[in-house]
């Protein structure tokens, strides 16, 4: 491409990394709590689930420093707690805008966050950079409709060169959705004024999923970049915007990235199957990331998708995670993330240490796993 810039690095591995960091900037050091044990499962979608996990940690004497919630929001605007009652309005979102008394999911999210903090556990919430196109089976979100209308009217979403809004093409994740143009200061202001109240409630970070949403070349970003030029840069603009928003004592947990991703940690190798083959690939990917300047990477202990890992794979994966930059276990939705292609198990498919021991009838597995969790802490 005529607009391409090619950099050639020579010397030892140490010299190459040093020159790369000089060019793109030094890595950002995550806060200390990020180096403990992260716990996560897609099925956790209410305060009762969080209470259950706190009880399990105490019962089985396992440490944790971060709890991740994926299914926490309305699954529409992605900044409103599921079940909250409110009136759609323009402008900044505030905690007092939402009534949680009738929610069957989150009756007191602020109190829950405070309790987690009292237990020494930080909270990370899932995010996705879209103004979602809702399905016919979904309850329409008045707030999402208001936000998307404002984004289009003020050209805060990514636009095509013909002046129409870009929509994620059919056949892709979140097809038909609009995506924010993070090259624009006004977009960043509008996007994050909706989420500032979450930090004020005590939320400690965001699991910034997705970002690989540029599938066409006939796009024109606010900074003049075309879709061809910005295809890879978009996900990094997304992470740069969130990094600037959260400040120093908060964390990101991201999947996509581009040149400069080492300055917006942490990244994880997401959605791999619970097989020995993919476990080997995780080691290769982690070493490759580290040699590319990405110091803080992670993966899902024992895998994320498909049938549960066997006890041997889960134990070896836990051992590797103990000595990896970030230690985290996570689980796909019940029935499988990719159930049309690769069904998961029915019922509780959680990759927690206690569920693994219960499923396989091996209570002694807990003692082995506890050793590596405590060694990490």
Language-model features and meaning:
Residues 1-377:
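Catalytic-domain carbohydrate-binding cleft regions of carbohydrate-active enzymes
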């Amino acid at each position: 491409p005529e607009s391409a810039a090619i950099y050639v690095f020579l010397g030892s591995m140490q010299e190459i990394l040093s020159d790369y960091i000089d060019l793109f900037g030094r890595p950002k050091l995550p806060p200390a709590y990020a180096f403990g044990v992260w716990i996560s499962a897609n099925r956790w979608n209410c305060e009762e689930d969080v209470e259950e996990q706190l009880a399990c940690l105490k019962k089985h004497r396992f440490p944790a420093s971060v709890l991740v919630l994926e299914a926490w929001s309305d699954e529409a605007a992605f900044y409103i707690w599921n079940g909250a009652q409110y009136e759609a309005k323009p402008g900044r979102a505030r905690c007092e805008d939402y009534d949680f008394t009738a929610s069957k999911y989150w009756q007191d999210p602020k109190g829950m966050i405070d309790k987690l903090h009292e237990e020494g556990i930080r909270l990370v919430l899932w995010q996705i950079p879209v103004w979602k196109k809702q399905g016919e089976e979904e309850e329409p979100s008045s707030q999402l409709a208001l936000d998307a209308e404002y984004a289009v009217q003020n050209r805060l979403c990514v636009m095509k060169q013909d002046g129409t809004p870009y929509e994620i093409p059919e056949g892709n994740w979140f097809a038909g959705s609009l995506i924010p143009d993070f090259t624009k200061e006004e977009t960043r202001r509008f996007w994050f004024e909706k989420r500032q109240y979450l930090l004020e409630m005590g939320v400690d970070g965001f699991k910034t999923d997705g970002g690989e949403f540029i599938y066409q070349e006939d796009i024109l970003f606010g900074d003049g970049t075309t879709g061809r030029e910005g295809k890879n840069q978009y996900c990094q603009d997304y992470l740069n915007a969130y990094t600037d928003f959260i400040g120093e004592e908060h964390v990101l947990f991201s999947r996509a990235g581009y040149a400069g991703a080492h300055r917006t940690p942490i990244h994880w190798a997401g959605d791999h199957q619970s097989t020995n083959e993919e476990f080997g690939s995780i080691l290769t990917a982690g070493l490759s990331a580290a040699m590319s300047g990405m110091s803080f990477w992670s993966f899902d202990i024992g895998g994320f998708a498909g049938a549960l890992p066997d006890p041997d794979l889960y134990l070896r994966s836990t051992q590797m995670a103990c000595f990896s930059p970030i230690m985290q276990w996570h689980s796909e939705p019940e029935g499988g993330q990719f159930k049309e292609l690769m069904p998961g198990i029915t019922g509780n498919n959680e990759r927690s240490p206690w569920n693994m021991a219960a499923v396989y009838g091996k209570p002694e597995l807990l003692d082995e796993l506890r050793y590596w969790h405590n060694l990490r802490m």
